[in-house]
Design a protein with these regions (language model features):
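Acidic, polar-rich low-complexity tracts and alpha-helical solenoid repeat scaffolds
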Residues: 1-239
């Protein structure tokens, strides 16, 4: 952090370099749970780089900060602008977060479930994975049947995989794949299940079976092309 601050304070340094350092320093402040310092730096970059990729990136970070803090209205105001960003990746990220907020503040108008979920996502950003998993378990207990349930299970499975709990990740994903009411994340869960079997558990036959399920059950899924490629490779087609 000291080195980044020195770059920012140096005279005659290229403005782009300074602002990139500010964004990185803002991220580090957020990792240290100092959001006010982070948003100050992001806002400076937003102001100096209006209508540019770096400025959009800073605005997206400010939107996430507002989301983490449970201020969904402010987050949405940032995201509405970013959805029109010229950078496709930023526009897509903004759209995803915007939809998450919209979808989960309709029935739960106070956004209590989403606030709990956002707090967990901040823990994930800070790499506090055991605390994040515990937070997800608490969310499932406090808000049974909440529209966020599938998102919660899916994120929990991802974190279990990252911490090496492959059996736990498989069991969690099966909560989604075995639920006939689950729809939006069903193909995501099935594809991740197949990857865990292939890459972590090393059960190639099971992975092949699951990739085939992705192809057959979800022909319109974004994962079909990759699932077909992996299925053929596991089958020994030499693709």
């Amino acid at each position: 952090m000291t080195l980044l601050q020195e770059v920012i304070d140096m005279p005659r340094v290229n403005e782009e370099v300074v602002d990139e350092a500010k964004v990185t320093l803002g991220d580090l402040y957020l990792l240290k749970a100092e959001p006010w310092e982070a948003t100050l730096l992001y806002s400076q970059v937003e102001k100096s780089h209006k209508d540019s990729p770096l400025g959009y990136e800073a605005k997206l970070r400010n939107a996430r900060l507002s989301y983490f803090a449970g201020d969904f209205k402010l987050a949405q105001s940032h995201l509405d602008i970013l959805k029109e960003a010229t950078t496709r990746e930023i526009a897509n990220d903004a759209m995803q977060l915007s939809l998450l907020i919209q979808d989960n503040t309709v029935e739960d108008t106070l956004g209590l479930g989403l606030k709990a979920y956002a707090a967990v996502e901040q823990l994930v950003f800070q790499n506090k994975l055991p605390e994040a998993i515990a937070g997800l378990d608490g969310l499932l207990e406090r808000f049974p049947g909440h529209p966020l349930a599938d998102d919660t299970y899916y994120l929990k499975a991802q974190l279990q995989r990252r911490t090496g709990n492959f059996a736990g990740a498989i069991a969690t994903l099966e909560r989604i794949t075995n639920d006939p009411k689950a729809d939006v994340l069903s193909d995501d869960a099935l594809f991740l299940l197949a990857r865990i079997q292939e890459e972590d558990v090393k059960d190639k036959l099971k992975a092949q079976e699951l990739y085939n399920q992705v192809i057959v059950k979800y022909p319109g899924s974004i994962y079909v092309a990759e699932a077909r490629k992996r299925f053929r490779k596991l089958r020994g087609d030499g693709v």
